[in-house]
């Protein structure tokens, strides 16, 4: 899929991986890049505009933990401005197993709520045009970092939720896939807390392993968006982009 002239909403598009990915996206000649983030960063927005002045870059403050009604209200404003939105990227995330409720609220519940809200505008059963959802998971959604089970569990939930969305595409008209970064050098992994302090030095130990840069991750992130494979579970690790084949152990039969 070419991203030229597409309208993209990027939740948390100013973070470590997020900002590098936003830089790559504007190079693809989007029509509009709408960034929703909790903290404004005028310098980053100005940089994105300077990279490609043909792309309209807009920022709205957004906390994914707000009620769905607030998200719907914001999306109404965005859809009124753009008329159509082609891609939603759900990228909000925290890594701190001290904050159990917030980790689940940001990494999973917020993603589900944002997705649910945009279905009001996209669902073909309501006369919508359909759309594409790219959810950011993590390799911990495949195999947990057991010292941070809350974070790992939230990312496993993202993978399952997104796989379900993909299978619902014939009903809703909305396709979905996950991009799952491996250990990436960002502020997210420089310092964080393990669950119940089971490993006080978990961040340091994690960074002893091979990592990738956020730029490497961002380049593969955008490649995954361009490949646009419904139901794909992408592994973005050590500068590579590979599809994951999920093993089915049970079938609901529905």
From Swiss-Prot:
Q: Superkingdom of the source? A: Eukaryota
Does the entry feature the keyword Secreted, yes or no? no
Q: Quick check: keyword Protein biosynthesis in the entry?
A: no
EC number, UniProt record: 1.1.1.1
Instruction: State the Gene Ontology BP annotations.
Output: alcohol metabolic process
Q: Which Pfam families match?
A: adh_short
Reactions catalysed according to its record: a primary alcohol + NAD(+) = an aldehyde + NADH + H(+); a secondary alcohol + NAD(+) = a ketone + NADH + H(+)
Entry-linked InterPro entries: ADH_Drosophila-type, NAD(P)-bd_dom_sf, Sc_DH/Rdtase_CS, SDR_fam
Binding residue positions for NAD(+): 10-33
PROSITE patterns cross-referenced by the UniProt entry? ADH_SHORT
**Active-site annotation:** 151
Going by the UniProt record, its keywords in alphabetical order are: NAD, Oxidoreductase
**Which residues are listed for substrate binding in this entry?**
138
- EC class of the enzyme, as a word: oxidoreductase
Q: Which GO terms describe its molecular function?
A: alcohol dehydrogenase (NAD+) activity
Q: GO CC terms on record?
A: cytosol
Its quaternary organisation is: Homodimer.
UniProt lists the family membership as follows: Belongs to the short-chain dehydrogenases/reductases (SDR) family.
Indicate what this protein is called per its UniProt record: Alcohol dehydrogenase
Task: Identify the species of origin.
Answer: Drosophila ambigua (Fruit fly)
Its taxonomic path starts at: Eukaryota, Metazoa, Ecdysozoa, Arthropoda, Hexapoda
Q: Which gene encodes it?
A: Adh
């Amino acid at each position: 899929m070419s991203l030229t002239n597409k309208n993209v909403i990027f939740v948390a598009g100013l973070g470590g991986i997020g900002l590098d990915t936003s830089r790559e996206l504007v190079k693809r000649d989007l029509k509009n890049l709408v960034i929703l983030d909790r903290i404004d960063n005028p310098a980053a927005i100005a940089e994105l505009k300077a990279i490609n002045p043909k792309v309209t870059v807009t920022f709205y403050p957004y906390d994914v933990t707000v009620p769905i009604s607030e998200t719907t209200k914001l999306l109404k404003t965005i859809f009124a401005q753009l008329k159509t939105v082609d891609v939603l990227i759900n990228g909000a995330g925290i890594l701190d197993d001290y904050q159990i409720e917030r980790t689940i609220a940001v990494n999973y519940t917020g993603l589900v709520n944002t997705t649910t809200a945009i279905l009001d505008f996209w669902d073909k059963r309501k006369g919508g045009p359909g759309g594409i959802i790219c959810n950011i998971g993590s390799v911990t959604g495949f195999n947990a970092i057991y010292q941070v089970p809350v974070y790992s569990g939230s990312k496993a939930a993202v993978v399952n939720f997104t796989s379900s969305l993909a299978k619902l595409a014939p009903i809703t008209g909305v396709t979905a896939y996950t991009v799952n970064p491996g250990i990436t050098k960002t502020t997210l992994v420089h310092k964080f807390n393990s669950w119940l302090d089971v490993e006080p030095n978990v961040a340091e130990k994690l960074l002893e392993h091979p990592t990738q840069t956020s730029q490497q991750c961002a380049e593969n992130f955008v490649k995954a968006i361009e490949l646009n494979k419904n139901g794909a579970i992408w592994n973005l690790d050590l500068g590579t982009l590979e599809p994951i084949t999920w093993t089915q152990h049970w079938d609901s039969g529905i």
